[in-house]
Amino acid sequence: MKLTLVQIFFMMLLLLLGLGMGLGLGLQMAAAVLEDSDQSLNDFWSSDSQEKAETTKEGDGTRTTETLLLSNKGVVQPVWPEETILAEDEVGGNKMLRADALFQSDKDYLRLDLMNRECNSLMAHKVKKRNHTCIPEYTFIHEELDTVKAVCKNPVVACDLKGAKCHKSSRPFDLTFCKLSKPGQVTPHCNYLTFIFEKFIIISCNDMKVKIT
């Protein structure tokens, strides 16, 4: 069947329109990627948090360098422009902020592979009972126990912990912060966002129980 000039014209027009839409969509996607790479942690945290750390989803990590304060209580609290209290913390595979579990084992301290730092994998071993509310947020410190303890040998620095002598790490530590993607999820169907950081830590070494503020 022979094509008329009018049909050829319309086919070319449709082809050009398709190419234009494809190019526009590609530019929008590129802009979205650039925007996501500069996204702040405040977008994923509660509205009363004003933190400005770069974030990623599903284990693809951009890094920031900030300071954490470790002390003697059982709560995690980053030192950011407006304090945000996290629920728990771990050094490697061990809970550092629960006195019962503090410094009990050196197993699985180094999990530096990004796939191993994906929060759904990290949090899987915490889902012990079905039909319970998922842990809303959790922080992991990916350092060896001896490295954390060695911070106590550093010079004393000022801190806001009453009566405590504080010591600051000489380098940032690797941290993974896990945030539940949506509230109200129930075990075992917990889905987490993954945020990877590097932060200095400050420790109150009075009794080696740890809090992050």
UniProtKB/Swiss-Prot annotation:
Keyword Secreted: yes
Alphabetized Pfam families for the sequence: RnaseA
A GO molecular function held by the record: nucleic acid binding
CC terms in the record's Gene Ontology section: extracellular region
Record PTM: The N-terminus is blocked. Glycosylated.
Predominant localisation class: secreted
Signal peptide: 1-24
Keyword Cell membrane on entry: no
UniProt-annotated location(s): Secreted
Keywords: Cell adhesion, Fertilization, Glycoprotein, Secreted, Signal
Tissue and organ expression note: Male-specific expression in proximal caput of the epididymis.
GO terms for biological process, alphabetical: defense response to Gram-positive bacterium; heterotypic cell-cell adhesion; positive regulation of cell-cell adhesion; positive regulation of flagellated sperm motility; regulation of fertilization; single fertilization
Glycosylation sites: 131
InterPro entries in the record: RNaseA, RNaseA-like_dom_sf, RNaseA_domain
Xref: SUPFAM superfamilies: RNase A-like
Similarity comment: Belongs to the pancreatic ribonuclease family.
Task performed by this protein: Secreted proximal epididymal protein required for post-testicular sperm maturation and male fertility. May be involved in sperm adhesion to the egg zona pellucida. Does not have ribonuclease activity.
Name this protein carries in UniProt: Inactive ribonuclease-like protein 10
Organism the protein comes from: Equus caballus
Gene: RNASE10
